[in-house]
């Protein structure tokens, strides 16, 4: 929008300047033609009385009406001679007086000159002063000059447009749209989870059934539902089950007579939420697993059957807290 406004202002200014130049040129031509047209003829020499001095009057390129000098044929009359002398002073007009075309109409000084003293040959001298005044010929040389005036008007905006053309690529580069990060959706909190530990024999060996049974009973497990062992709230087997122990080999069940029984390991698991404090139950579960591993000569593994580490224990605790918060 601003570029279009500036372009319009430049075009209007160019038109105004060209109009002023054409008007000034036309006025100068008009004044110059009027000056050459009104240039008067050389004045005729007049001889005056023997007592007066002869003077040659000639306008130095004066522009104005031709003066008519009176020729006195009666030199004897001194009074008339003296009265006629001041008349040329009144008839004298400065050269710039004729610049105004209508001033020759006013001729009060000539009325003071008696008509009897004005010679007849002076009349044709006045005719060329009035003949070159028609205004129609002045318009003819001016009219063809006005016609080419619109041509520079059309050419003037061209440099202006060229001046604005390089301004287009100067536009500031738009910043690339920055993709807003998608809102991070909070993971739904777990409503329940299963914490799993394993007690396994060393590589290439198995756990003895009789030693395993004694260690399980010492840890407070009691054989029960689904043919697996459970750790209840009370050591005598009363109360809800806190966590359970199953065989690592499918189907995961046990035979109560475990004298001739061997296995590569057992799995201890706890469902969360559970009865009581889940974190306290988890500590009790970890202690039971360590006790059984010490008794049978095995190791405690995580749910991926890797060595249990402090980081994995903290991960189990975080899961328990998450479930507790989800069910709070």
Curated annotation (Swiss-Prot):
Residues 51-63 have a biased composition (Acidic residues). GO terms for cellular component: cell division site; plasma membrane. Pfam families: ZipA_C (PF04354). Keywords: Cell cycle, Cell division, Cell inner membrane, Cell membrane, Membrane, Transmembrane, Transmembrane helix. This is Cell division protein ZipA. Belongs to the ZipA family. Residues 42-186 are annotated as: Disordered. InterPro entries: Cell_div_ZipA, ZipA_FtsZ-bd_C, ZipA_FtsZ-bd_C_sf. Residues 100-115, 123-171 have a biased composition (Low complexity). Interacts with FtsZ via their C-terminal domains. It is found in: Cell inner membrane. It comes from the Bacteria. Essential cell division protein that stabilizes the FtsZ protofilaments by cross-linking them and that serves as a cytoplasmic membrane anchor for the Z ring. Also required for the recruitment to the septal ring of downstream cell division proteins. Residues 1-6 are periplasmic. Its main location: membrane. Residues 28-328 are cytoplasmic. The lineage of its organism: Bacteria, Pseudomonadati, Pseudomonadota, Gammaproteobacteria, Enterobacterales. The chain crosses the membrane at residues 7-27. It comes from Escherichia coli O157:H7. It is a single-pass type I membrane protein. One of its GO terms (biological process) is division septum assembly.
């Amino acid at each position: 929008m601003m570029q279009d406004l500036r372009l319009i202002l430049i075009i209007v200014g160019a038109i105004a300047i060209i109009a002023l130049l054409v008007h000034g040129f036309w006025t100068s031509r008009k004044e110059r033609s009027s000056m050459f047209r009104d240039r008067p003829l050389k004045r005729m020499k007049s001889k005056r009385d023997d007592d007066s001095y002869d003077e040659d009057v000639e306008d130095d390129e004066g522009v104005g009406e031709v003066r008519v000098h009176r020729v006195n044929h009666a030199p004897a009359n001194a009074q008339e001679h003296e009265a006629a002398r001041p008349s040329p002073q009144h008839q004298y007009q400065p050269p710039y007086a004729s610049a105004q075309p209508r001033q020759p109409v006013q001729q009060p000084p000539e009325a003071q000159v008696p008509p009897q003293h004005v010679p007849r040959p002076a009349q044709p001298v006045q005719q060329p002063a009035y003949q070159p005044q028609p205004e129609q010929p002045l318009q003819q040389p001016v009219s063809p000059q006005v016609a080419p005036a619109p041509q520079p008007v059309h050419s003037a905006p061209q440099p202006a447009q060229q001046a604005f053309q390089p301004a287009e690529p100067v536009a500031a580069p738009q910043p690339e749209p920055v993709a807003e990060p998608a809102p991070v959706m909070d993971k739904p909190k777990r409503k329940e989870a299963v914490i799993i530990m394993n007690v396994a024999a060393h590589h290439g060996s198995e756990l003895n059934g009789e030693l395993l049974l004694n260690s399980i009973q010492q840890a407070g497990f009691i054989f029960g539902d689904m043919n697996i062992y459970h750790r209840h709230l009370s050591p005598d087997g009363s109360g809800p089950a806190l966590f359970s122990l199953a065989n690592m080999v499918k189907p995961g069940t046990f035979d109560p007579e475990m004298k001739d029984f061997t296995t590569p390991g057992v799995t201890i698991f706890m469902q969360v939420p559970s009865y009581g404090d889940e974190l306290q139950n988890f500590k009790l579960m970890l202690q039971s697993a360590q006790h059984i591993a010490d008794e049978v000569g095995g190791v405690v593994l995580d749910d991926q059957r890797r060595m249990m580490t402090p980081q994995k224990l903290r991960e189990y605790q975080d899961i328990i807290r998450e479930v507790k918060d989800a069910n709070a």
